[in-house]
């Protein structure tokens, strides 16, 4: 009886060992990579950056290294890579959102909603240009980014630039109108006021007090 029990126990140990080894063999390969959260980056590009090849044993996928390699792309703000057993790897990407850009001698610098200059590249269509003498001042730049980020999608396409001043900001529209924004505060209400004035006649508007909009 003891010999039989010992034999059963040994068999269980062997089976457990085989089961533990399976993920590291070609029996359980990666059959697909699922990429989510990417907009600017092409899915194929993310797959290439991960370095994960279809057919790689699931247990041999180095998810930490894959995440580090994807994070090396300037568009990537953060990334998570995890195994989705039995045969897939999930790559969840959070990209920088280019809300604004600055034209410099070396090219167009994209600025995200945190004020980070993260890439020199062609700006997206919905990014707003930042101009003016104070654009190099970090505090003024943060204020300008906050203004640009608050502009609604419906208004954004009509805004050509935000002029960065020391304490005040002005918006220029694509058709040459001016909107005085004032200080970078109460931006949510000013953005709502902006939606209204863009539908009005006039060449110059002031939304620095969003509850008392003026025009001329």
Question: At which residue positions do the language-model features occur?
Answer:
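Second-shell loop/turn segments in exported
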Residues: 52-57, 129-137, 178-184
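Periplasmic polypeptide-binding modules associated with outer-membrane biogenesis and secretion
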Residues: 4-41, 48, 57-107
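Extracytoplasmic
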Residues: 28-30, 41, 73-74, 84-88, ...
């Amino acid at each position: 009886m003891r010999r039989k029990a010992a034999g059963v126990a040994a068999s269980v140990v062997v089976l457990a060992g085989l089961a533990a080894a399976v993920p590291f063999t070609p029996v359980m390969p990666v059959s697909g990579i699922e990429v989510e959260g990417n907009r600017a980056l092409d899915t194929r590009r993310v797959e290439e950056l991960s370095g994960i090849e279809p057919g790689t044993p699931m247990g041999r996928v180095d998810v930490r290294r894959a995440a580090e390699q994807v994070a090396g792309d300037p568009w990537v703000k953060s990334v998570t890579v995890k195994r989705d057993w039995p045969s897939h790897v999930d790559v969840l990407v959070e990209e920088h959102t280019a809300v604004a850009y600055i034209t410099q001698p070396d090219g167009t610098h994209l600025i995200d909603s945190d004020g980070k200059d993260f890439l020199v590249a062609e700006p997206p269509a919905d990014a707003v240009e930042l101009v003016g003498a104070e654009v190099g001042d970090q505090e003024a730049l943060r204020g300008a980014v906050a203004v640009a980020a608050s502009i609604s999608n419906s208004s954004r396409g009509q805004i050509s630039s935000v002029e960065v001043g020391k304490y005040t900001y002005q918006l220029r529209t694509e058709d040459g109108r001016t909107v005085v924004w004032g200080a970078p505060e109460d931006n949510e209400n000013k953005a709502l006021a902006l939606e209204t004035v863009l539908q009005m006649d006039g060449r110059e508007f002031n939304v620095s007090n969003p509850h008392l909009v003026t025009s001329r």
